[in-house]
Amino acid sequence: EPGTSAGAAYFRPDSEAIVARLPGWQVWSVDRRENALEDHSVLDGYIAGKRTQQQVFDYYLGWLTDPKISPHFTAPTDLSVDFTRQWGMDVAIGDLHQVVGQAKKLGGKVVLGGHSLGGAIATAYATWDFNGKSGSDDLDGLVLIDGASGPGSPITASDANARVQKLATSSPFLDLVGLGLPWSAGVFTALGSTAALSSPDAASLAYNWKLFPAMLKPPVEPTNKAQFGYALDTKTGPASLELVQMHIGELAPSGAPRGWKDDGITPVQRAAVAFAGIEGVDGTAWYHPQKLSLDSSAVNGGIANPADAVLDVHATHGKDLHIPIYAFATSLGNQRVLDAATALAKQSGLASSGLTLVDRASTYAHCDPIAAAPDKNDFLKTVEPFLHNIAS
């Protein structure tokens, strides 16, 4: 299950590594229903080599400063997708229940994992009440990658009511970059990552575009690969984008346009693969429902609380988790993720042997686990034995 503003493709690097190392396993990645609102028409053409870098840039971004560009991307208006204000945890869990059901039909073990907000969604699923039955009854394990939900201080019912009322008059979608264009973060990342793969050494078109955020711009004109790496690296990316940061590298010492030098645990190419797309799918969510993030504040490790009724959250089987739990913490989730996993295990009476905790808060950024090189990736090195034990 992807995290905030994330799409199915960003599990691609780890998925390929896992199925190569663990014969018999499949990795299914969820593209939530909000991803169906995205317009991949020209981006798909670029990936297929049928559109140029300039054409794809103009279609999605260039038209904002050049009214002569037509046809161009048009985002749905808030009014036209007003129904998305209801796309919260209940909707996401209902959709995920269908996916888990299909996986169970194969007859093997089913392990549910999630990164970031996806970890909270995975926790919600495992503790969800499906007509008196716990969601964990469908599962053989739980993998929480720098995201989870533990019991403690859920949102109050009054605060939940206030947030719901505010959402009714604001955009249904998260504006991660703050440009008043909720889709822009997804488009920037999808285009930047795809250009880093398709035209890595060409000059970045975004760099000289007048609306490109200054916080993302290197001090010199970069290649596509360098622009992408610079924007997402922990040393140079803005703090506001900590959700997508990795230890990638740095600008090359020379060159015009300036290239990129890998010197971190995550090569820039693997980082780009995580966010670039295949046909119709990329590693971002251009339209992340604010209701989904709001609802996560009431999951509370599956312990019922007054906000549940306000937000239509049904995670109430927090003491019925009798499946192995794995948790991996980076600098963003930090001790909170490990504490949440520990609390989940404790409240269900899970034996210590059923809990695997991996603390890399001092060395891993939030997205390093999903894209770090396999030979350096401590997530892969520790989750693979966890999965092997479940299968045996």
Residue map of PLM features:
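Short, surface-exposed "cap/lid" segments of acyl-processing enzymes
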Residues: 1-62
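A short beta-to-alpha transition loop/helix N-cap that caps and shapes the active-site region
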Residues: 36-40, 148-159
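Alpha/beta-hydrolase active-site loop
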Residues: 46-104
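Gly/Ala-rich beta-loop-alpha elbow adjacent to hydrolase catalytic centers
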Residues: 113-122
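A conserved short beta-strand
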Residues: 132-154
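Alpha/beta-hydrolase
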Residues: 153-328, 332-336
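Catalytic active-site module of serine/aspartate enzymes centered on a nucleophile-bearing elbow/loop
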Residues: 303-320, 326, 349-392
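Conserved loop-alpha-helix segment in the C-terminal half of the alpha/beta-hydrolase fold
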Residues: 328-357
